[in-house]
């Protein structure tokens, strides 16, 4: 019997110091001492290496060796005109990204279930051809790995035609060239007003830019508003707008031809920085002086109080109850494979409970933040984070903060905007967690006396993405009753704007001259459930009060509660608009029945406060048309792998993927189905968001819960459950496993040295 124990780590550290200190060279490796308890059985995260993906790991992200092989092959095939994406200008040809090309589902299942040969392992490369007569974006499938011999252009096949070049993602070099243009060429033209308001000195480095998106107002545009902020060292500059925003047209392939189209300064618009400076010199600009307070103040994340007693620690008295081998997680109840899409973020595959597959894929697709405000940058912004890359901007997980100290940490290899692969250390964590809550329990002292229950212990898979100012904590949680919980929390810095005029219509003032801008957060998920097989049906259930004559007293009438059931036949019937009505029970069911004659099913239960979607008459709405629906169920198709695209951000007016096209009223009866789930919330920033937004109350998601899938509650077979009745000695190990705690937990956790994955270079 495994038991989680809460201990004060402080005690362990004091004990460890007597023997060289916990995590010190002397302390590590000592197994026993007359004055110390023995070390608990454990496995260091270093014992969980990222192995080379073999044929059994169909969904494992590409290894460093595979990434290198693909890059070498493409470099050879595409010729000498390729430029390192890290240095590429818009007029260059470069390989933007290489990642795993997911295998077709039919081929994957044939291998997993029927031992057919595994499908070819392939990579997907995105190439920017800025140096061709007709600049374009091309998608290439490369295989087979690990020794590629072919590449296949799939751009037309997937997108119906070539991808216009203006849809390509803004490379880091492009941002650097924009900064060089702004700081070296443009700002000196308004040196007087900027020195007066913002302590500006040419080359002084006290200002930084922050991008917005989308870049313009119609297809073909590539004109982006950039806000300027104080460069606050070792703290979030996002809270320090100076009131200057610049509209940069960077569509030309030659950076020398880029221009400033419009200037916004502290509530007024100007044609150029020259005009702003002229009006300032003429005394026609009312300048608000923005103090530069350096690193001090409430916006720093460095605590102003000394450390206190160490928080509680969860550890494993009898060793971990799960294993991570390559990309596969295995516990006594659950197995699944995990990965990280470079743009779409965390994803899991082949999810099984007690050996039976429940879902083929559960994956994040897109995350969107829509802002409002009375400055141009604030009012225009609709961030579509798949464009920036929710895998690309995954961050190292900090031991003991992002995940429990003793979690298992796994690295991720990627090739993005570079000629060589890189490694993000501690990109994922997997851990088992005592929720401090009974999964089920009952105490009876009526008629008979007994107690039975089981603690809620969950298995968690986690990653974190930091997109500019915001940090997204992505969780997939596996419960012992067969339920899966998918959720995300938001933390980090809010985005802010210069406070003027009617600013309070768009948020709250959070510091002097600073508006915390109102915005929404939404995420979209793909849920490919296979409930008892590939053929599934969609059922909706709710309740109604029905007037009923009382059988034994016909002169009286009551309102009787009853269940209303309906099988949904088409995709239109199973698409539920955000903000509209929806059945409180919606589940996918098999043609199989449980012991009681009900179809075995899995219910989708959303926990979301997304509110109203972007109106459909908005010019950018089609790029995020998935936001129209809180839930939609469609036929699964290989031609509809994702609800969004990395290219939607830079051309939302003619989106590369329009999710609404997936819903075309096809039958969903007895088909392989995918549920698409939206979760989100409204955020009106307030004083308590300074310096950081907290995760409390800022988490949403959904549950996948068994609904007549089993014959009874599956945790009845849990080895963690306890039961004792009147007359039994509840303090006996033979009766109650928890009574064995003093013996089972007489060990000290073998704590690894604190580590942090560093600060990746993008």
From Swiss-Prot:
One of its GO terms (cellular component) is extracellular region. Keywords: Calcium, Copper, Disulfide bond, Glycoprotein, Metal-binding, Oxidoreductase, Secreted, Signal, TPQ. Residues 23-54 are annotated as: Disordered. It holds the Pfam family Cu_amine_oxid. Binds 1 copper ion per subunit. Binds 2 calcium ions per subunit. The modification 2',4',5'-topaquinone is found at residue 470. InterPro entries: Cu_Am_Ox_Cu-bd, Cu_Am_ox_TPQ-bd, Cu_amine_oxidase, Cu_amine_oxidase_C, Cu_amine_oxidase_C_sf, Cu_amine_oxidase_N-reg, Cu_amine_oxidase_N2, Cu_amine_oxidase_N3. Ca(2+) 1 binds at residues 528-530, 672-673. Residues 1-16 form the signal peptide. Cu cation binds at residues 519, 521, 683. The active site is at 385 (proton acceptor), 470 (schiff-base intermediate with substrate). It is found in: Secreted, Extracellular space. It comes from the Eukaryota. Inhibited by amiloride in a competitive manner. This is Primary amine oxidase, lung isozyme.
